[in-house]
A protein has these predicted regions:
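Bacterial Sec signal peptide processing site at the extreme N-terminus
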Residues: 18-42
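Catalytic cysteine-centered active-site loop
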Residues: 56-107
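Recognition helices and adjacent regulatory flanks at domain boundaries
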Residues: 47-51, 57-58
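Glycine- and charge-enriched low-complexity intrinsically disordered segments
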Residues: 150-161
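...with weaker cross-activation on analogous glycine-rich loops/strands in unrelated enzymes
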Residues: 36, 85-147
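Stable alpha-helical elements in mature extracytoplasmic
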Residues: 42, 46-49, 69-70, 74
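Sec-dependent bacterial lipoprotein signal peptides
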Residues: 1-24
Length: 161
């Protein structure tokens, strides 16, 4: 009889141990899974976001209409318009999704630029030729990827949806 009680107690302890280990497991990384989203829906959502934020001043670390930085604008756009949680910083955003060539850009793809020795910039492609971003000098704007500056500093593009 004591062995039955001991066996039952061991199973309970083992079960609790398994539950504890499972509860401590790290959650999956956000926006790592790439799944199709209709491009016209994404494009429409991006234009809605641009209309709402157009001209908002650039502010490093900013996350509001009082001022927003480039990765903050990307973070807020994906969260509010596309229902996706992306990392907050440009560096971490540059590590998610799948790499795409500039010729394959679609609305919603992230475009990354190396604008200085240790400086990165991110925006969101509207199509193969334009992107929306928080510019240090102009705030939230649409810029052309054909512009010499952006062509020379283009680092990579990634698809995260």
């Amino acid at each position: 009889m004591n062995s039955v009680i001991l066996s039952r107690a061991c199973r309970v302890v083992l079960g609790l141990g398994i539950l504890l280990v499972a509860a401590c497991a790290a959650p999956p990384k956000s926006a790592q899974a790439v799944h199709p989203v209709e491009t016209t829906t994404v494009e429409s959502a991006l234009y809605d976001q641009y209309q709402a934020w157009q001209g908002t001043a650039y502010r490093y670390g900013g996350m509001s209409k009082a001022g927003v930085d480039c990765s903050g604008f990307v973070y807020l756009t994906y969260r509010d318009q596309l229902g996706m949680q992306l990392p907050r910083t440009t560096l971490h955003q540059s590590r998610i999704g799948q790499a795409v060539s500039p010729q394959q850009l679609q609305a919603g793809d992230l475009v990354f630029f190396l604008t200085g020795p240790n400086t990165r910039h991110v925006g969101i492609a509207l199509d193969k030729h334009r992107f929306v971003h928080a510019s240090k000098s102009k705030g939230v704007v649409v810029s052309s990827l054909a512009n010499d500056y952006w062509q020379q500093t283009l680092w990579q593009a990634r698809r995260v949806y």
